[in-house]
Each structure stands twice: as C-alpha cells, then as structure tokens.
C-alpha cells in the first residue's frame, strides 16, 4: 500500500504543476487536468487512510502528517482557484511550500517512510 500511496501523491504533484502551467497559458485543457488532479486527490487520501488504518499503534505524528497532507491538497486548490480568478496567489504558494516540506519531512521521518532522516 505504501507504493500505491507514493505513486498517487507523486502523480498528484506532477498533475498540479501541469495544471498550473496550463492555467497560466490559458489553455482550454486546464479544466480536464484539474479534474484528473481531483481524482488523484481522492486516490491519495484513500491510500493514505488505508495506510493509517493498517498501522498497529498510531503515533500522533501520523495524525499530524494526515492533517498536513489535507492542508497540502487545500493549498493546491487555493493556488489553482486563485489563478483561475486572477487573484494574487502568493499566500497560497507559501502555504503549499510549507505544507509540502512538512509532509515530506514527516513522511520520510516516520517508520513507514524511507530512511532519509
């Protein structure tokens, strides 16, 4: 299940940057990519929930990682919707960067992740 989760969030991040670039260029396919991105949000949340459910003793750090992961998805949506409306997205980008760094740090630090830290 770990590999499915890593694959889903990796595809989610790639689709996010594709959606951002299409949104900036004003391409008509941006809406299709955003719908695919939202589908991968669901895959990421489901696989993350299944991973969380499979842990015998859940540390508070896993709960924090899940909350930060949901925050990251929210930040992605704030960036894309702000760009679509033509608003300033600096705050949303800062939130995205902070949440992304936190979720990666927690993901790699916890026992189900890789031994990077």
UniProtKB/Swiss-Prot annotation:
Key word Transmembrane helix present: yes
Pfam assignment, any one: DUF1516
GO CC annotations on file: plasma membrane
Alphabetical UniProt keywords: Cell membrane, Membrane, Transmembrane, Transmembrane helix
Membrane-spanning ranges: 2-22, 32-52, 55-75, 97-117
Cell location: Cell membrane
Membrane topology: Multi-pass membrane protein
InterPro entries found in the cross-reference section: UPF0344
Protein family membership: Belongs to the UPF0344 family.
Protein known as: UPF0344 protein GWCH70_0687
């Amino acid at each position: 299940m770990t590999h499915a989760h890593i694959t889903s969030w990796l595809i989610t991040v790639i689709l996010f940057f594709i959606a951002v670039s299409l949104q900036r260029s004003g391409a008509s396919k941006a809406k299709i990519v955003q719908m695919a991105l939202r589908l991968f949000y669901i895959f990421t949340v489901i696989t993350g929930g299944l991973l969380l459910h499979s842990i015998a003793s859940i540390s508070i750090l896993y709960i924090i990682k899940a909350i930060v992961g949901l925050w990251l998805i929210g930040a992605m949506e704030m960036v894309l919707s702000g760009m679509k409306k033509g608003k300033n997205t600096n705050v949303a980008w800062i939130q995205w960067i902070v949440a992304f760094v936190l979720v990666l740090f927690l993901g790699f630090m916890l026992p189900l992740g890789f031994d990077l830290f």
